Amino acid sequence: MPKRRLSATLACYTRRRTLRPCVPAGDEHALEALEALRTAPPVNGDHGHNWGVNEYISRGISGQENYMNAYRNAARAYQCALLWKITGDEGYGDVAIDVLNAYRIYNKGLAGNTNVSLIPGFIGYQFINAAEIMRDYKKWPEEDFELFKQYMIDVWFTTAQDFLERRHDTVEREQNWYHYHSNWGLGNALFCVSLGVLCDLPDIYNYGMYWLKEGPGNESLCVTALHPDAFGQGLCGYGWGLIPWFHKDERGPLGYLNQMQESGRDQGHAMAALGLLSSAFESAYNQGDNAFCNLTNTLIPGQAGAAMVAGAAEYVAAYNSGTDDLPYKQNWWMGGLNATGRGQWRP
C-alpha cells in the first residue's frame, strides 16, 4: 500500500508545508493567498453558512434535488480544514469536524436517477479531502473518525462501484463501455482512490487506479493508448478513452497537443476532466505511486502517461485562455470546440 498520512487529493499537505511557515513570518504573498482562501465562498470571511444535512442526497429528479446542500457543505468542510491546518485556529477545525460528523450521523444514502452517479465523484471526494486533513485533529475522537470512514464506505462507495461496473446497465445493453462521457468514470475513480488513501485500504485504492490506468471505459488512459483512431485517421464514432486524439503540434509537450474526450463540451466539463484526472494522479503521487510515469503508450513515441496528460493540459488550457487555432478531431459527440464558459474562474 502507498504511504499513509499524506493528503488524499490536491497535495494540500505539500501546500501546507510551504504556506504555513510563511504566514507568521509576514510573507506578503502567503498572507494574500491566505486572505483569498479565508474570504472565498462558502466560508466568506467567517465560518460559513450551514446548509443542513439531507437524509438522502438526491440528484436528477425534478423537485427532489438537494445535492447543492452537500456540495456547499463539502466545500465548507474542506476550506475550514485547510484554514485550521494553516492557521491553527480551532474555530475552523471545529466547523470542519461538525460538518463531517453531521453527515456521518444523519445522511443515510444517495438517491436520484442516473445522475446519482455524479454525487461521489463531484462531492464525496471533497468530504474525504476534509477528513484526511482533520484526521490528526485532537478534538476529533478516534472513534468518530473510524465511524466516518465506515460511513463513506457504506453510503458512498457502493454508488461509485455500481457505476464503474454497470454504468446503469448500458454495458450489458449496448455491449460497450462508452455510453457516458469520461467525467462520470473519472469522478467515481477519483472517489475510490481518495477513499482508499483515507481508510488505508489497498483494495479500494487499487480499484480506483485500475479504472484510470487499465479499465475499459472513457475515463481510462489505457483505452486511449489502444484506440485505433488515435492518430486522427478517419471519424471515430464516440471518441473512446480519456485522451482519444494526439495532434502533432510544436506548441505541445514533445510536439503534441492532445484532445480529450470531453473537449468540445462547454468549458466547465472540459476543464473538469483535466481537474479530476490531475487530482487522482496527484493523490497517487503523494503516496509514492508515480502513476503518470508508470503508464506507457506504444502508439506514439514519447507519449507515455506524463506526456499524454501534459499534452492534454496544454490543449485544454490553451483554448480556455483564448487560443483559437487549435486542431480538433470531429467525432460523434461533438463537432468542434465549445466556447461556453470560456475564461471563467472555476472552483
Residue ranges of model-derived segments:
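Long, repeat-rich segments with strong aromatic
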Residues: 196-328
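Active-site-proximal alpha-helical scaffolds that flank and shape metal-associated catalytic sites
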Residues: 150, 179-192, 203-206
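Extracellular glycan-targeting catalytic surfaces
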Residues: 1-174, 186, 190, 210-213, ...
